Swiss-Prot record:
Organism: Mus musculus
Renumbered residue ranges of the record's region Sufficient for dimerization of proICA512: 449-575, 601-732
Cellular component terms (Gene Ontology): axon terminus; endosome; Golgi apparatus; neuronal cell body; nucleus; perikaryon; plasma membrane; secretory granule
Compartmental location: Membrane; Cytoplasmic vesicle, Secretory vesicle membrane; Perikaryon; Cell projection, Axon
Membrane topology type: Single-pass type I membrane protein
Modified residues (Phosphoserine): 307-308
Keywords annotated in UniProt: Cell membrane, Cell projection, Cytoplasmic vesicle, Disulfide bond, Endosome, Glycoprotein, Isopeptide bond, Membrane, Nucleus, Phosphoprotein, Receptor, Signal, Synapse, Transcription, Transcription regulation, Transmembrane, Transmembrane helix, Ubl conjugation
Biased composition (Basic and acidic residues): 113-130, 303-322
Residues on Lumenal side: 38-575
Tissues with expression: Detected in pituitary. Detected in brain (at protein level). Detected in brain. Weakly expressed in the colon, intestine, stomach and pancreas.
S-S bonds: 56-65
Protein name: Receptor-type tyrosine-protein phosphatase-like N
Gene: Ptprn
Length: 979
């Protein structure tokens, strides 16, 4: 016979994960129409492979469909190489999307099964063969005939002879397991169900991680039978009763203790399949046509109560017109039968006489005490099964399935076959509780409370167990701990405590810990004993596994999931040190951020003061008094060569402007001395209320209409002045006198200096006269901030134009960029060519602007003048002030400090365009309104000033700021007018 090939060949790669594919294939639902049911393999895992005329016979591995009982086939000799070979084959079939119902799957499996060696079962005793079917028809025979119409009765299956030489002779049902009573009852009471319709293939069932949803690694989902006990596993809601379940196949195989399964070499089947996903369980698709079909009672007697559907009452309602005879039956038997039927929602009066006689005979044939256990199982566990199925259908992984207790029986299995049982029970590992000893009349049942807590109940004796399930755990230093490493650790621990590795059940990994439970063992070791021994042999376990064991103990599942990871964290010193450092770094970061915020706030308050302090001489701020100004005036007067008495001021301050063009030395007229007047009376305006409101409404509408404002600005940008030549400014000798090459004065509108008085012997300076209405007298001179080599030209322009007011709109340095050179002395006096400038006072009016007073003396003519500089500090380059109020207050100070204006005001920023043009536009428009002009066109006014100097008002924001400032000033004027 051909030897099976080793893994790694064509059969597949083997190893963990392959058995997950095996389980998914075993759980695939649906049957293609072309699949033949003759000799179909896998019926132990999917009973729908066999038709209602076929039976599923045991072949030692998957099960095979056969028409009729026939002759028992030899069992397969399953060895480790065989299992590995099948694992690879099933993995390849799984990768192709095939299931048990596909022809290709059946063909391949058939070929592989032919290669497996066979074992001939021992010849049964003549009494055994005669005991399979009753010699005389009787109630028990009727029961088997009615209860198993599909041929799934134990006799039809050809049950092997029980171990120990027991036979089926004598009473036909004397050795029938108590677990088989509920299926027989259900087949007896319920009519045969039609076969399943073809189900569709569900790819989601192939997900290898369905274990976390319906698996039973944690021990809370699944069932276990003690050795040799036939257990009925959990079935989906859509699946009808079947004796050929996965747990049933495990019990059938367990009866062959005399075969060669205990002599296997190499790793045991349980070790091969444990980490390969064989314990995974998938939920079958519900069948609409079978939604009301009865389910196989779980736990050997726990039948789900479908009281809401009332299926049993509907089926039996028409059969029980008359009550069965009860007087002739023993009272005890009637009580037992009543208790059993109560679990199914059936009353005695609903039974036919034939059904009543059959059930009563069956109860009498059962061993004494079994009925009582069954009654408790039916009454206690029915509601839990229904709840469990509903939770599985909802896919709720948080609610654990109730454990399925096992009932005592007579079929036993050898230790060697128990390993094969684990392999052939893919969906059901061992139960989470320690089973009662064989033959005990007490059955431990566990109910699930609404909070998910396990509540064990013992039928027949008081409860001796705590209400919560306990698990042993071993915490390691490896996180996450793999399942393979956890199983390896438990195998080594089993060797040290002289236990079988199969004694560990419900093995799972929670973070760095492996949790487990202990089944009943020969040494009678409990969880506490095993964990204590693990602590004693800690060093040996660490040496053999390479893991560091941090803690061992016994606790609940919740503790293993929640408490253990925290303990592992607390044990690691490096982790605690890192967490402490991170926390300290976070606190330090918060403190640093708070300190930076406070420093920035303090710096913002001191920035203006420091900036103002840098503009003036040291120690000069406290000495600027009006007395000092008077002393300076007296000092400058005594130094006059002509020693004239100062005359009465003339109404016009430009009456002596012509003296600038005279070569003879002339006295300095008082008209060129600006007399400060710090009055705060409101400006006199010739605006009436109606005109003011009209202008204000127009300005507000202009500002609200953003589209109109944008179109107006676009038109202003497209405007070109005529003429617009700048030849003088672009001359090679004058290029270095320009701060910005884009803002140059027009040839027809520029200030010309006297060549004979200029140190550079040139008449050029980057300055433009701005005429308001009188071409003979400009109202403003717009100029750039003086450069270091043009300061003398600037003072010459101030002297020759007769200006007494300078409006400076830029700081000297902004964001590290020099905006303007200092053209006045820090303290005392400074000489610029022939012009001596003496700083008289520097007064900080507010945080936004300050005022300086100068004496300007021409050393050639010995003439002295007084002038005032208003320096605005809160206007950023190419931007606008944060509010219009500071600039409007600044403008009022400029206009109120001097009576009349007969000479131009010098206005400069850095480039002499953006901020300079905005201030001139605001002041010009407001002056026109103060004179009573009825029509105001700000855009036309801007075009007018741009005809005289290019680039005035550089941005749309500056233009909008000018409109806003005009509107607010008009509003202030209207409030000041008498109502």
């Amino acid at each position: 016979m051909r030897r099976p090939r080793r893994p790694g060949g064509s059969g597949g790669s083997g190893g963990s994960g392959g058995l997950r594919l095996l389980v998914c294939l075993l759980l695939l639902s649906g049957r293609p129409g072309g699949c033949s049911a003759i000799s179909a393999h896998g019926c132990l895992f999917d009973r729908r492979l066999c038709s209602h005329l076929e039976v599923c016979i045991q072949d030692g591995l998957f099960g095979q469909c056969q028409a009729g009982v026939g002759q028992a086939r030899p069992l397969l000799q399953v060895t480790s190489p065989v299992l590995q070979r099948l694992q690879g084959v099933l993995r390849q079939l799984m990768s192709q999307g095939l299931s048990w119902h596909d022809d290709l799957t059946q063909h391949v499996i058939s070929q592989e099964m032919e290669r497996i060696p066979r074992l001939r079962p021992p010849e049964p005793h003549p009494r055994d063969r005669s005991g399979l079917v009753p010699r005389k028809p009787g109630p028990a025979g009727e029961l088997l005939t009615q209860g198993n119409p599909t041929g799934s009765s134990p006799a039809a299956q050809g049950f092997p002879r029980p171990a120990g030489g027991r036979s089926w002779g004598g009473s036909p049902l004397s050795s029938l397991q108590a677990e088989l009573l509920p299926p027989l009852l259900e087949h007896l009471l319920m009519p045969p169900q039609p076969p399943h319709p073809a189900l569709t293939y569900e790819p989601a069932l192939l997900q290898p991680y369905l274990f976390h949803q319906f698996g039973s690694r944690d021990g809370s989902r699944g069932s276990e039978s003690s050795s040799g006990v036939v257990g009925v596993g959990h079935l989906s809601k859509a699946e009808g009763p079947a004796l050929f379940s996965r747990s049933a196949s495990k019990a059938i195989l367990g009866t062959h203790s005399g075969h060669s399964f205990g002599d296997l070499t190499g790793p045991s089947p349980a070790q091969l399949f444990q980490d390969s996903g064989l314990l995974y369980m998938a939920q079958e698709l519900p069948v609409p046509g079978r939604a009301r079909a009865p389910r196989l009672p779980e736990n050997g007697g726990n039948r789900a109560e479908d009281s809401s559907e009332g299926h049993e009452e509907e089926v039996l309602g028409g059969r029980g017109e008359k009550s069965p005879p009860q007087a002739a039956q023993p009272e005890l038997s009637l009580q037992r039968l009543t208790a059993v039927l109560a679990g199914y929602g059936v009353e005695l009066r609903q039974l036919t006489p034939e059904q009543f006689s059959t059930l009563l005979t069956l109860l009498q044939l059962l061993p004494k005490g079994t009925g009582r256990n069954l009654e408790g199982a039916v009454n206690v566990g029915g509601a839990d099964v229904k709840k469990t199925i509903q939770q599985m259908q909802r896919g709720d992984p948080a609610e654990a399935l109730p454990p399925t207790p096992s009932l005592p029986g007579y079929l036993t299995a050898s230790p060697a076959s128990s390993e094969v049982q684990q392999v052939l029970s893919p969906g059901f590992p061992e139960p989470p509780h320690t089973p009662s000893p064989l033959g005990s009349s007490s059955v431990l049942l566990e109910k699930k409370s609404p909070l998910g807590q396990s509540q064990p109940t013992v039928v027949g004796r008081p409860s001796a167990r705590p209400s919560a399930e306990e698990y042993g755990y071993i915490v390691t230093d490896q996180k996450p701990l793999s399942l393979v490493a956890g199983v390896r650790l438990l195998e080594i621990l089993a060797e040290h405590v002289h236990m079988s590795s199969g004694s560990f059940i419900n093995i799972s990994v929670v973070g760095p810990a492996v949790t487990f439970r202990i089944r009943h063992n020969e040494q009678n070791l409990s969880l506490a004993d095993v964990t204590q021994q693990a602590g004693l042999v800690k060093s040996e376990l660490e040496a053999q596994t390479g893991l560091q064991i941090l803690q061992t103990g016994v606790g609940q599942r919740e503790e293993a999931a929640e408490v253990l990871p925290r303990q592992a964290h607390g044990i690691s010193p490096m982790r605690s040190v890192l967490l402490t450092l991170v926390a300290l770094a976070g606190v330090a970061g918060l403190l640093v951020a708070l300190a930076v915020a406070l420093c920035m706030r303090h710096h913002s308050r001191q920035r203006d003061k420091e900036r103002l302090a840098a503009l003036g001489p040291e120690g000069a701020h406290g000495d600027t008094t009006f007395e000092y100004q008077d002393l300076c005036r007296q000092h400058m007067a005594t130094k006059s060569l002509f020693n004239r008495a100062e005359g009465q001021p003339e109404p016009s301050r430009v009456s002596s402007v012509s003296s600038q063009f005279s070569d003879a030395a002339q006295a300095s007229p008082s008209s060129h001395s600006s007399t400060p007047s710090w009055c705060e009376e409101p400006a006199q305006a010739n605006m009436d209320i109606s005109t003011g409101h009209m202008i204000l409404a127009y300005m507000e509408d202009h500002l609200r209409n953003r589209d109109r404002l944008a179109k107006e600005w676009q038109a202003l940008c497209a405007y070109q002045a005529e003429p617009n030549t700048c030849a003088a400014a672009q001359d090679e000798s004058n290029i270095k006198k320009n701060r910005h090459p884009d803002f140059l004065p027009y040839d027809h509108a520029r200030i010309k200096l006297k060549v004979e008085s200029s140190p550079s012997r040139s008449d050029y300076i980057n300055a433009s006269p701005i005429i308001e209405h009188d071409p003979r007298m400009p109202a403003y001179i717009a100029t750039q901030g003086p450069l270091s080599h043009t300061i003398a030209d600037f003072w010459q322009m101030v002297w020759e134009s007769g200006c007494t007011v300078i409006v400076m709109l830029t700081p000297l340095v902004e964001d590290g960029v020099k905006q303007c050179d200092r053209y006045w002395p820090d303290e005392g006096s400074s000489l610029y060519h022939v012009y001596e400038v003496n700083l008289v006072s520097e007064h900080i009016w507010c945080e936004d602007f300050l005022v300086r007073s100068f004496y300007l003396k021409n050393l050639q003519t010995q003439e002295t003048r007084t002038l005032t500089q208003f320096h605005f500090l809160s206007w950023p380059a190419e931007g606008t002030p944060a509010s219009t109020r500071p600039l409007l207050d600044f403008r009022r100070k400029v206009n109120k400090c001097y009576r009349g204006r007969s000479c131009p005001i010098i206005v400069h920023c850095s480039d002499g365009a953006g901020r300079t043009g905005t201030y001139i536009l605001i002041d010009m428009v407001l002056n026109r309104m103060a004179k009573g002009v009825k029509e105001i066109d700000i855009a036309a006014t801007l075009e007018h000033v741009r005809d005289q100097r290019p680039g005035l008002v550089r941005s749309k924001d500056q233009f909008e700021f000018a409109l806003t400032a005009v509107a607010e000033e008009v509003n202030a004027i209207l409030k000041a007018l008498p109502q």
